[in-house]
A protein has these predicted regions:
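Cleavable N-terminal export/targeting peptides
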Residues: 1-28
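Generic structural motif
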Residues: 4, 38-40, 152
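Short glycine/proline- and aromatic-enriched beta-strand/turn motifs that initiate or cap beta-hairpins
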Residues: 20-62, 66-68, 100
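N-terminal/domain-start segments enriched in small and hydrophobic, helix-friendly residues
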Residues: 25-34, 90-91, 148-152
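Solvent-exposed loop/turn segments connecting transmembrane beta-strands
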Residues: 36-46, 68-77, 102-110, 135-144
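Gram-negative (and chloroplast) outer-membrane scaffold detector with strong preference
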Residues: 51-128, 151-153
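A general structural signal for short secondary-structure boundary/capping elements
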Residues: 127-129, 141-146
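C-terminal binding/interaction regions
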Residues: 131-133
Length: 153
């Protein structure tokens, strides 16, 4: 069952990437760092993360990320999310997100992400953001909050 779920998730990400790559020249890119906190029933920790964002269209953005958790052992999460951007008054943007995740805490597991975020430009090249998402796997469920800054290019 895990293999079927993994294959399905990877196929969906691959298909979305292929479909959206047609629009690559339409959007901007950004790279950012963030800090946050993750909490689960058996795990709570501060985290540091890095992300790359690519606006495939005016409203759809792909966002792969890597988060390192400062627990007693090496813990990290690799995610690939899709954001649907809603501009508000030409400054704020809010977005729901949906994606896939690979977690390495006590065990290695694949799963999904669901959440939302908001961002605000502080200049023509930088923006600040806040995001919350649930990371769901078969044996592990975590809610992660993050605040960050990103550079647009």
């Amino acid at each position: 069952m895990k293999r079927i779920l993994l294959l399905t998730l990877l196929s969906c990400v691959g298909l979305c990437t292929q479909i959206l790559s047609v629009f690559a020249q339409q959007g901007e890119k950004s790279v950012g760092i963030n800090v946050g906190y993750g909490t689960a029933s058996s795990f709570e920790s501060f985290r540091l993360g890095a992300e790359f964002n690519w606006n495939a269209t005016d409203h759809i953005r792909l966002s792969p990320s890597f988060d390192c958790y400062f627990a007693s052992s090496t813990s990290y999460v690799v995610s690939a999310d899709v954001h649907y951007l809603f501009p508000i008054k030409n400054t704020w943007q809010v977005y729901p997100l949906l994606g896939v995740t690979y977690t390495h805490f006590m065990t290695n597991e694949f799963g999904g992400n669901i959440g939302a975020g908001v961002e605000y430009p502080i200049s023509s090249s930088f923006y600040v953001s806040a995001e919350g998402k649930s990371q769901l796997t078969k044996d592990f469920q975590q809610f992660a909050l993050a605040a960050g800054v990103a550079y647009k290019f």
